[in-house]
Amino acid sequence: MDHAPYGGVVPEIAARAHVESIDAIAAEAMRAADLGFDQLDGVAATAGPGLVGGVMVGLAFGKAVSLARGVPLVAVNHLEGHAVSARLGADIAYPFLLLLVSGGHCQLLEVSGVGACKRLGTTIDDAAGEAFDKIAKTLGLPYPGGPALEKLAVGGDAARYTLPRALLGRKDCDFSFSGLKTAAARIAETLTTDDERRDLAAAVQGAIARQLSERVDRAMKLYKESHAPDEQRFVVAGGVAANGAVRAALLADCEKNGFSFAAPPLAYCTDNAAMIALAGAERLALGISDDLDAVARPRWPLDEAAALANPANAYGRKGAKA
């Protein structure tokens, strides 16, 4: 079912679509891989964080296959899937500095191995991808808004509008996009021409790319204090990693600070099953699996210690944020 008329994902529609589609999609995936279920060595299923209705459907399906075939289950944090997604297209060794940037998440992490993440910074309000999508909606663009805004921004004059630069000069690695989102929405209400909309799209894209670049530059300096030169690897993952302006800004950070750059193939920037399979395979290779009583988790921080240490940024009314 199409979420576009609603301007975003509707949880109830998404959960029902999972129920209706998962059997056929799993069967098609096995046909495409030319494999039978009897050839599986294990099953990896997303257990969170995310909209819990859909997560429960996928996790239940994974448990059923695990039980029926007698193979181990790995309940995967989907953020860990993003963390390893660049390894789908390249041989990237641990450790590395990761920018995980999507519609729901914006974090900087040191990734030292499978499941070993130390958070350096996170958003204190909205994620970058959410800012892209919400501002795109105010400009009358279709969902998903990020790609539509990037397309509109081509040829726009980013200097036409002055937008706020949040947390400028801060020595930490946190992000903030709520002020940008509000300012852009107010400007959007006054626009009357396509050129104005194009220029605002370019300004928004530039502002988001600039803030990501500034915080990554800070994180690289911190990372270098505790890592050898041959460990200076940078990975960007998540849906926003597909944005060309963002990639260009982050590439410039890498060149400035002496880091290698890696990102998933464009097809694997957004949520996908391949990254979950890889995360599960890496855990299985280390002998790590989960019991069939693994639960679906709407919130699941990658760095539990950081979440506990900074509850103001890490916890909401419904528990630990991702």
Predicted features by range, described:
Residues 1-49, 78:
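N-terminal beta-alpha supersecondary unit
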Residues 36-47, 226-240, 262:
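Short glycine-rich phosphate-binding loop at a beta-alpha junction
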Residues 45-69, 244-252:
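Short Gly/Thr/Asp-enriched flexible loops that form oxyanion-binding sites at enzyme active sites
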Residues 75-97, 279:
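Conserved phosphate-binding catalytic cores of ATP/NTP-utilizing and phosphoryl-transfer enzymes
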Residues 75-76, 233, 251-276:
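Conserved phosphate-binding/catalytic loops in two-lobed NTP-binding clefts
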Residues 82-85, 264-302:
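Glycine-rich phosphate-binding/hydrolytic loop that grips phosphoryl groups
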Residues 92, 100-101, 108-196, 252, ...:
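A short helix-loop
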Residues 151-234, 241-257, 304-322:
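A contiguous, well-structured pocket-lining segment that forms one wall/lid of small-molecule binding clefts
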